[in-house]
């Protein structure tokens, strides 16, 4: 069953024992973020968290860590909670091929129950805001989806973007938003500012898990997140029309904020503890003016803790980064077998491939760095043979330790682009990139002595299946 809203997803998590309801009174700071942080430190299978007794807030409901374990991620895809990670990614890939599935426009969204306009807006009254890390410069919306359109082609449904961007709440109806240059919203903003125009946006909070996953997925510029959400949930994704902008927004959201990114206006935003596990510091960022708020009665506020991995954002971004990189590489290089870009939104990628000829694996690694996502993220690539599973780190370490000769297997590319949030970049946004070729050399690259590999015995696969069945029967 596909989830049309956050509430049905929370119910499914609860039904599977993956929602922990905390009824005791807690402090907004530091308890909410600290509890979410702790879910990444207590082992596999961490639950989502629900708080409804928060000191200082009246009738507030906060959900955290909803996708913050492989069990929760599986449930979001309507898979059994115990589905292995690799099978979840394989299913993601299978459903990807359903694209596009046209969305379903619905009337009477629950978020239309209450509205506030103009100077009457006070986000501090509507949202139970709290800091996520003690060095953050303010309150942040970090799991909301932002909808924008191409100002030069506003009726092109595919060019309408749905993405997750951090936003600092700076006033009653004022936000600071960080449009990463490699992301579609930055291109929309650039086009608007060239014309001297504000960029209208709609911000959706408290969303179903599939559109949240899509907001973190690097699609091509003209691929619709709503059509891909339909493919991923295997049914048309429900949308509704936002009343002020006329944009397409999720039908099941808890809160809709509408307004504009003000043209050519920048103010200091940050610091903020980022997915890189480091604070990003303060920078001049865009300013958002909110002109209309629509929200459900008793809305659920959802936030996401992020810091040193693993936290919820790693579960959210991991498969959502692997799959598009795999699909884009596979389309050009059918030899590619698998892509593991689970680490820090793909700043590191491990790619397995067959090889046509010597040097082929390095060409694949270079192409990974020049995909739409790779331009801003893929900083290091480890290339491995087709018989090495990039999701099996012991196998990857074996390939690195036995097949890499630093004299010829390291390719360093100077002065390449990367997102400014990468703490290793210097200056911010510029870095050297590295390809590590841990594949077996093939002609005409005849280095090394790899003619006598030890392979699994022919009967090993059958015995593995037999032992697995015996263990399952014993349990």
PLM features: residue spans?
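Extended, highly charged
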Residues: 1-272, 277-287, 291-475
């Amino acid at each position: 069953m596909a989830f049309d809203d956050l509430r049905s997803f929370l119910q499914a998590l609860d039904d599977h024992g993956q929602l922990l309801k905390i009824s005791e009174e807690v402090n907004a700071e530091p308890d909410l973020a600290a509890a979410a942080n702790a879910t990444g430190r207590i082992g596999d299978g961490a639950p989502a968290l629900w708080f409804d007794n928060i000191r200082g807030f009246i009738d507030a409901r906060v959900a955290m860590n909803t996708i913050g374990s492989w069990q929760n991620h599986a449930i979001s895809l309507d898979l059994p909670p115990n589905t292995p990670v690799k099978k979840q990614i394989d299913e993601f890939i299978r459903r990807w091929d359903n694209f596009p599935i046209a969305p379903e426009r619905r009337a009477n969204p629950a978020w239309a129950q209450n509205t506030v306009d103009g100077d009457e807006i006070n986000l501090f009254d509507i949202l139970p805001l709290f800091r996520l890390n003690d060095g953050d410069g303010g309150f942040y919306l970090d799991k909301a989806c932002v909808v924008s359109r191409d100002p030069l082609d506003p009726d092109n449904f595919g060019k309408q973007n749905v993405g997750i961007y951090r936003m600092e709440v700076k006033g009653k109806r004022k936000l600071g938003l960080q449009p990463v240059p490699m992301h579609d919203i930055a291109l929309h903003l650039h086009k608007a500012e060239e014309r001297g125009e504000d960029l209208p946006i709609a911000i959706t909070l408290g969303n179903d898990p599939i559109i949240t996953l899509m907001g973190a997925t690097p699609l091509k510029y003209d691929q619709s997140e709503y059509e891909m959400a339909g493919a991923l949930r295997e049914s048309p994704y429900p949308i509704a029309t936002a009343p002020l902008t006329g944009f397409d927004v999720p039908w099941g959201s808890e809160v809709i904020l509408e307004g504009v990114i003000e043209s050519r206006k920048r103010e200091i935003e940050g610091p903020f503890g980022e997915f890189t596990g480091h604070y990003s510091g303060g920078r001049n960022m865009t300013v958002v003016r909110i002109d209309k708020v629509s929200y459900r009665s008793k809305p659920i506020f959802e936030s996401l803790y992020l810091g040193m991995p693993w936290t919820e954002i790693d579960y959210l971004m991991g498969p959502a980064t692997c799959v598009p990189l795999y699909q884009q590489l596979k389309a050009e290089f059918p030899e590619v077998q698998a892509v593991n870009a689970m680490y820090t939104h793909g700043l590191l990628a491990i790619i397995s491939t067959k090889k046509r000829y010597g040097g082929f694996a390095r060409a694949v690694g270079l192409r990974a760095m020049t995909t739409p996502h790779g331009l801003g993220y893929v900083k290091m690539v480890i290339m491995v043979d087709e018989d090495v599973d990039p999701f099996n780190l012991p196998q990857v370490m074996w390939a690195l330790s036995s097949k890499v000769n630093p004299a010829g297997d390291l390719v360093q590319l100077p002065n390449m682009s990367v997102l400014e949030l990468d703490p290793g970049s210097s200056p911010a946004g510029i870095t050297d990139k590295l390809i590590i070729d841990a594949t077996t050399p093939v002609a005409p690259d005849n280095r090394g002595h790899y003619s006598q590999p030890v392979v699994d015995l022919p009967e090993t696969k059958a015995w593995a299946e037999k032992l697995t069945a015996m263990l399952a029967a014993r349990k």
